[in-house]
Each structure stands twice: as C-alpha cells, then as structure tokens.
Amino acid sequence: DIKKGEIFGLLGPNGSGKTTTLKLLLGLIFPTEGRALVLGKTTNDVAVKNRIGFLPEESCFYRFLNADEILDFYGQLFKISRKERKARIDRLVEQVGLGFARKRPLRQYSKGMLRRIGIAQALINDPDLIILDEPTSGLDPIGTRETKDIIVSLKERGKTVLLCSHLLSDVQDICDRVAILDKGKLQISGTIDELLSSKDVVEMLIRNLSDEAISEVETFIKEKHGEVISVKNSSGTLEGLFLKIYAANINNSKTDV
C-alpha cells in the first residue's frame, strides 16, 4: 500500500521479485491470484496508464534522434498538444541537465546522459505516479545528487514515486518508506526511522569540546551504567567531498570570468 505523495523504496536482492512487481503494476503481466490496483484502478485501465511515468532499468531509444525529438515522440504518444510538448521539453531538458546537448543525436550520449533523458521521458506526460527502476545507474556523483533532487521535487509537487535501487544509500536519503522483498515475498516494510532506529543505542554529535571534557563525559556515562561504544572524530562522505570540490571549481571558474 503506497500512499499518495510519498517516495516509496522497493528493495531486494536479485531474483526477489522487484521487476515482477513493477511489471504487475504496469499491466505488462497479470497476477495468477489476487489483484493489483494502481491509482485506485485495475492495471489494465488505459486511463490509469496515461497517469504513470516509467523509467526501466535499461532504456531503449531511437539513437538517431536528439533529446528534443525523442521527447517530442513520446509526447505525441500521449496526445499532448504541440505547444504543451514544446513547453514541457524545454523545461525537462534543463531539469535533467541536458540543455547543452539537446540537439545531439542520442548515439553520442554517454550512459549517464541516456539515463537523464530516460528520466525526462518518464516525466513528459506529467504523471501522478512515477516508477523509477535504478534511476541513478550510470550517473556520476553530481548527476546522482541532481537526480535525487528531482525525485524530491516531484514529491513536493504531490507526485507519488516508486523507486527501485540497489544503492541503499540513495534509498535511505530520499525515501519516506521502504519495503524489502525476498524470494517473492514481502519481508518487512515501514519508514526509514522505524526500520533503522535502535532504542538501545543513542548517537550524540558534539563540537567544541576538549579532550579532557570528552573524557569526563565518558566517565559520567560509565557511572550511569552506560557503555561507550566508540569515540571518534566526525567524518564526511566521498560524495560530499566530491560535490564540495566540484562546487569550489565552479565558483573559481565564475571568478576567473
């Protein structure tokens, strides 16, 4: 049960049933038992399919077309007017960071660029439900961060996002709730906090404290029968460092100009 306006992560090892679940929701296959409802309707309802955007794990495009042309093609399939198609295409190519390459044929695109145009394709019909299968596959840290920002912005606009990814850090960053499948069965589901929080372990972030004061804090905790598991300096992430260097170089380039 996925709630309207949330980002829901679907996780599981290879062969767990994630792709089968997506195919059921898209009406590409049908259940042998029970039923699947999407936006309150059965999955064979054509009107419902018009309200869904889908990014498959591997996108197949006509590589001789450029970004504008491929998005226009998909827009025509949804019977979007020419004026509205142009407005959406202009917005989407900029949103996914492909404005500089919109007139290049897709055969000249890198894997990451093709992933970006795939995301734009999934949004061309302004869907209510967006299903994304490995959306950050092939993207560098900058593209990954921008893609996650796009997904969060969809939620802010009231869209519902179903996200499948093997990159658990991405899921943890942006998903409201997750479900874990294994061997075709739901193993567990809930919010990130519900699934990961531990009542027995408390984390404290402290700054501007001397080594002597830290030692006193440790002693106090032990006196209260607590256990200090580790004390170490705070560290960032490689993604954070990468983005920091990239932002600094961008600022330096602007200064040089």
Can you say where each PLM-predicted feature lies in the sequence?
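ABC transporter nucleotide-binding domains
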Residues: I2-L163, L168-D182, I188
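Short, charged/small-residue-rich alpha-helical element at the C-terminal edge
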Residues: I192-V257
